[in-house]
């Protein structure tokens, strides 16, 4: 993700 800190992508 760009807005949130996602574990992948």
Swiss-Prot record:
Tissue-specificity statement: Expressed by the venom duct.
Keywords, ordered alphabetically: Amidation, Disulfide bond, G-protein coupled receptor impairing toxin, Secreted, Toxin
Subcellular location: Secreted
Tagged with keyword Acetylation: no
Modified residues (Glycine amide): 9
Domain of life: Eukaryota
One Gene Ontology cellular component annotation held by this UniProt entry: extracellular region
Role summary: Interacts with high affinity with vasopressin V1b receptor (AVPR1B) (Ki=8.3 nM), although the displacement of specific [3H]vasopressin binding is incomplete (a 30-40% resistant component remained). Has weaker affinity binding for oxytocin receptor (OXTR) (Ki=175 nM), and V1a receptor (AVPR1A) (Ki=827 nM).
Note: Negative results: does not interact with V2R (up to 10 uM).
Protein family according to the UniProt entry: Belongs to the vasopressin/oxytocin family.
Protein name: Conopressin-S
């Amino acid at each position: 993700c760009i807005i949130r800190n996602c574990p992948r992508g």
